[in-house]
Amino acid sequence: MGDRNLTPKQFGALGEQYAAAWLEEHGWTTLSRNWHTRYGELDIVMLNPEYTVVFVEVKSRRSMHYGYPQEAITPAKQHNLRKAACDWLLDRRNRVPHSAVRFDVVTIVLRVGRPLVHHIENAF
């Protein structure tokens, strides 16, 4: 999984794909992937088993040399993700019965062998 020949965009997409599959294995349902707004992109929108709509920001790295992946989610990025999430919730095509909304972060270190996954619930 840690193929050095991937472009940064391909590497990020691989991390998002792995995160979605990992969450689906835990009973979550994918509602949207790579949803674009004027505020940026929502990586993954999922419905968890408790009927919470979860906006999942995925950060992938090849190593921990540059710090924790979640450190890349600045307050400004969080602000834009909240605005994008509001747009997603207001879009009629995204109507889904839910009991709550939250923001999670999934970090993935794609290394040789098995990727290291860390799921941070209610990250911000």
From Swiss-Prot:
Gene3D superfamilies per the UniProt record, alphabetical: 3.40.1350.10
Superkingdom, natural source: Bacteria
One GO MF term: nucleic acid binding
SUPFAM superfamilies membership: Restriction endonuclease-like
Family assignment from sequence similarity: Belongs to the UPF0102 family.
Database matches in NCBIfam families: PRK12497.1-3, PRK12497.3-3, PRK14681.1, YraN family protein
Name by which UniProt lists this protein: UPF0102 protein BL0935
Biological source species: Bifidobacterium longum (strain NCC 2705)
